[in-house]
Every structure is written in structure tokens, then in C-alpha cells.
Amino acid sequence: MLKTDSLDFHSYLPPYRSLINPNARYDYRTHSLIPLTQNDLNLLRIAFQKKKEAPPSAFKMKYKSLLSDVSRTISMRLSNSNLLSSSSANNNNVLLSPPPSSSSTLSTPCGNILNRAGTTSSNISKINNLSQNQTQNQLPLFPAELHIKNLPVEILDYIFYLVDDNLDYKSCMYTCKLFYFLAKPYYYENLVFTSTYRFAQFVTYLRVNSEVGQYVQSIDLSGIKPGYDEDEQEEGQEENAENGEEENGGGARDPQYLLGEIADNPHHERVDQFPRGKILAGWRDWKFKNNPLYTIHPSPSLTKIASNSQFSNVSSKSSRSTSSKSSSSTTKKFVKPFRYFKSRKRKMSYSGTTKLERKSPRLEQLQLDQYSSNWNKRVNSHPLINKFLLHYSTSKDLPIGYILHMINLCPNIVSLNLGNLSLSTDYEISRSTIHKYQNFDLINNYPKDLIYKVDNIMRLNDVDDVYSIDGSILRFGNINSGSSGSNWERNGSSSNNRILFKSNQSIASTASSVYSVTTFSKPIRKYNSLLPPLPQTVADISYLNKGDGKVYLSDLNLKEINSAYLKKINEDEILSAIINVHGKRLIEYDTSLYQIPKPLNVDIAGTLKYINLSSMIWLNRKLIEKFLTRLLTKKSPELDMYGICYTDEFFDSDEQESDDDYEDSDDEEQRQCPIIYKQNLVIDFTDSGMYKSLPWAKRIDLNSFEGCQLANKIINNDLMTPQEQALRRERRRRGAIAANYLA
């Protein structure tokens, strides 16, 4: 028999040392990290230090080189756990026991290293004592562990504050629990949505996990675009035409190649009519995601095909109507369904006379210069519109219920931009019948253990390992904030990542939900036969307490229900929600500190600093008057006499004299009236209302005198057209007829 020599892979593979965890080595046999004890590290340090301090003579170095290589011995010890464990044990015996004999020292691997540092056994004990004294005086070779987790939380928060990039915050959320905990508040701080689909996902997630709304401080919905934007598609079509003429010399594309692209897209029936063939999904696609009437059913099984003879007839008719190769291949597949269960026969003859025709592969060109790699397409992909909802492709409306959810669940908003927003009619479900529709809620689009996973990530303690990246960590997709937007759909490549956002609602349950509530199949309780089920009232109460406690028709995957359970919501409910969450608060002022005999009430403003309600055709003067009256705070004149409210130089004397309305007024209180509305708030009503150039449809800056003056006129219903204002000035200039006659 041939005898094979064992290969020493240590001569080819260097000892692995990790920069993250230097106290561990990598074993190439077991493919695992093995920690090094402090005794092993001290032993290696002594060997290296003694080699540098006492260089032997040339004869000894030559003699040692004949025996073995010191560097190779050290590398072998770093890669062999048995040698390190034995050397550390023997090192402890040497330090604690009396000096052994030379023969016993040479019999162990530790003795071999120490024997090279000295020639006699007495010198070994001296070297050990000397090395112990030196290690106490010198700094350790491997200092204490330095990691970002050892920094205070305030410093870590300031570091993440300086990042100021949404994509970087998203990458930090994929790193570890500590980074997820620190980056999450900054990631949701400023949100800018461009897709109604992403905003619908965000609102549903707010109802599932309301704590996320505490982080939001700015929301911008003014950039919402439809799924099919004609201007953008025309620009992209012109760019593609120019690029095609430059690359292909003005030649046309292969029709077979176009057929291949259409066959890959399940919604190719009407997509090919649009330029570039790309229509993004809207909020209705998220609403009817689990509704079987709006979803694409999978292909039927082979047993059903074999039992149903009509299917082959239908397929044969469809094959006669189409002449493409893809349709003919599908008909051949369904003509003989049991062909796949038989063993395949070899058709190639062994005589060698027949020659197989080899098809030439399709040539493809790599576009390395463009930012369109497969990874980016997978991560930044936006779902396309359903073919049953193509007539909504040019609409960019949002239901009123989503806006109300956002306002109620985000109490810390500082900037709210709803400019150019188109609203669609929505209905609120009566509270007495909400529990009947909880199985059809869009909350079921997310897994039931979503809150548990998020809470587990956000719960940091000493047991958590911040170094590891758990594969089961909840990974959100792209959130379209700014250019990236809000993506709540998982786009991971692994199957575990895809399962996380898989709907828990079965096909049978969704099918029954379309017809009636009473036919809904009861869930099968596995392994819970010994435990009593929870009462229905407990489940109903927990469902009613989710989110803001309100459910709208847009929150269900049903198109319509009984109108007796519905209540129509008007657009003015948005103004009422803003007032309830961010309106002024009336509190009693503590008068004991200022020795005031009677209690005083003071208005406290909310957190809002900017509201954009421009281009809202449903707004009118009465709604604006009511909105400003309940939103704006006033400086109490009763506190001025006690010196509690400070008085600023709100406007210059020139500005005050230039205003004719307040200049000609004899009442000093009327002249100073706009000052009481001064606050850090900007409200934009530009181009709102049914008509153009309305006197109240302007930008109101309450930090300026003009803004406070306009707000005062709106509240007091004192708005006039320019002609009426000119007539009023002329009357004041002339005065009364009797007064001029007597003068």
C-alpha cells in the first residue's frame, strides 16, 4: 500500500489573529475561534522578550536552527489548542513548584521554549522571577479591551447625531443591537415620502408599533408622486432613445428580446402601453395585498389539470390564438401532465450520426458605469402596480384616515408639510363593530411577533452581545426619506428574511373574508388543548387599544362593508386632529410666587413650528378662522402689569407708522392687538381655496408683524379686498361730514 505523507498546513496558512477579538485564535481544522487564556499570552510574551534580550552566540543560533525553527514553533502553538493548554498548565507548575530537573523540563513543550532561554534548570527559576517583575513594571502587551460599547451613552448619541445621513443610519441599524438602538431615533426623525405605497406601509406599522411615532419630528408629503408620472416617463424615454442611438447606431431592438421581457413581467397586459413599462404600486396595492380578488393566484397543480379536461381545451384555444414560442411551450406542458412523473428516455443515438443543434447564447452587455447592479435593484426595488388596479396608476391621492393616523400617532412633530396633497374620501367604522373586522385589518400584513422582535432588539442589557449580527433581527427595507423614501418591505436574499414579512393570513381566511364575516374559519390551536383559550373580549380589547383606537375603511382589505357601520369623514377632520394634538393648552399660572390675589390662566403652545396646507381647495375662511382661534396662543395682558410676560420690540416704529389701518385708529389696544399672537410658528395657506388670490390664502409668519396682523384680521373677520381698504382709508382721511363742517 502507498503511504501518504501528512501535509503541514501551518507552513502555508499563517496564524489567524482577529483585530476585533485579539484574545482568540482561529483553528483551521475545526473552523472555530478558540480563546487564549492569560497564561498562554504571558508564556508567548516571555518567549519573545527573552529572545530579544539575550541573543545567543553564532554557534548556538546555528545549533538551534539545526533543531527547529523558533518562529514555526510559535506559529504551531498558536494554531494548536492542545499545545497551548499543555504549555499553560506546565507554566503554572513551573511558577508554583520548586525548580524541576533538566530532563523533566525538556520532556514538555513548555520546557523546550524555556530551555532555549537558559542552559541550566537554576537559570529557569531566575528567569521566571525576573519576567514576573518586569511584567509588573511594564505595560501589558495586550491592554484591556477597548470598544465603542464602553463609551457613555451621551457620547454615543452625539456621535450618531453628527452622522446626519439617512443611508448611514440605515446601515447602522443592520450592524448590531447597540447601533440599532442608537440609530433608530435619528432614522425616523425626518421622513420624506414620494410613494403612496410606502406611506401606507408606514401608517400600518405605526398602528402596530406606536413607539416609532415618538421619534418622528418632520414629515413631508408634498413630494408624493403617482405610480405613473407622464413627465418623468417622457424624460426617461427620451434619454433611452438617445442612449440607444449612440450604442446601437440607431438600430431597433430584437422583437424576440422584447417578448422575453414581457414574458417575465406578470402584469404585461397593459404595461407595454406605457413608456419604459414601469408603473409603481400605490396605497391600494398595500390595502388589497391579501385580498384574493386582487391577487394573482398560483398555477394549478398537476392533479387538478389531469382531472379537468376543460383546461386542456382552453389551453389549446389559447395556443391557436397566439403564435409565440412561449405560448406553444405552455400548451405542450399541460397536454401531457403526467409526463413529468415518468422516467426520461434518452433520445440521443449512440451511433454518432445525429448532431445536436446548439443554440447560441444571448449576448448581454454589462453596464458597469450606471448605478444599476443586481444588488441595488434587489434592495431598492419598489413593487409594481397590480394589473387589476391599473386605472389608479395616474392618481396620487391618500385616504383621510391615513393622515389622521399619522397626526394622532406622531405627537412630537415639529414640521408638517401637506402641500399639494390630494385626499380621497374615507369612512370611520363604528366602535361597536370594530372587533368584527379585526381579521381583515392591514395589521395582518405584518407578522404577529413583530412587536416582540422589535422590543427584543431595543432592550439592551449586559447579556446582549453587541458584536454579533443576529440573522433574525428585523431588517426594514428602504425608507423613502428624501431620495430614499420609506420602504417597509423586506428585500433580504435569504429565505428567513422573506418569511419574516410573510402574511399570517391563510388563503382560506382571505377568501372567506370577501363574502361574509360569519364564514371565517376558526384558527386551529396546536398543543393548546390543555390550556383554556382566551376569552373573546380580551382579544377585542387588545385590538381596540392598538394605535389611536380608530379604524377606517382604508385600514381593511375589504372594498366595502355595510353602510350602517360607516361614518363619512370630511377633510376638516384633519384640522381638528391638528388642534387636538398640537393646539394650545390652558393652564393655571402659579400666582403664589408673585403675590397675585387671583389665579391667572395662561395659554401654552404646542410643538408645531411649521404647517404647510397650501393648494388645498377644500379650505375656506370659516375653517381657517376656527383653526387659528383654537391653535394660536395669546399673550395675556393681565400678566404684563406684574412683569411676568416680557415685552419685545416686536416691530420697528417705521413699520408701525407705515400701516394706515392701525395708524389712524384712536384705540391703543386695537393698535397693539396683533402683538398678542407673536410666536414661533409659520402657517402656509398659499393658493388654497376655490378661487385665486384670496386675502387669507397667504403665508402667515407669526414672527413678523405682517403675519400677526393677517392672523388678527382672519380671527376678527376683518379681511377686506384692496378696493375696500382704499375706500376705508379715504373715509378716515376725510372724516365725518359734520366733523369737517364744524372744524
UniProtKB/Swiss-Prot annotation:
The keyword Endoplasmic reticulum does not apply. The keyword Zinc does not apply. Residues 224-257, 311-330 are annotated as: Disordered. It comes from Candida albicans (strain SC5314 / ATCC MYA-2876). Residues 145-191 form the F-box domain. Transmembrane segments: none annotated. Keywords: Ubl conjugation pathway. F-box protein probably involved in ubiquitin conjugation pathway. SUPFAM superfamilies: F-box domain. Residues 229-248 have a biased composition (Acidic residues). This is F-box protein COS111.
